[in-house]
Amino acid sequence: MRFVKSFILMRKRETELLDYLKQRGIKQLVICGMQTQMCVEAAVRAAADYGFKVIVPHEACATRDLKFEATTIPAAQVHAAALAAMNGTYARVVKTETLIAELR
């Protein structure tokens, strides 16, 4: 198992991680982090586009309230909407305890 601090598969010029994964025959990734609707979702979509099966442990992701004009969208709603958009299309979104049980 390898942990990567920054996951940038979406930039064509940064292929070191992609090469590392492909050379080792890795087919499944677990992606988590901050800004569920930004960094996490971008990484998930890029990984799925490259053919990886992706798992997102939803309690291992987080975000913040977002503001647009006079509207504030609570972090919980932003988080849930991003997870709903990813689940079943680009990733399998699971509870962290489910993922841990599957990895044992």
Task: Label each region the model flagged.
Residues 1-104:
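Active-site-adjacent betaalpha module
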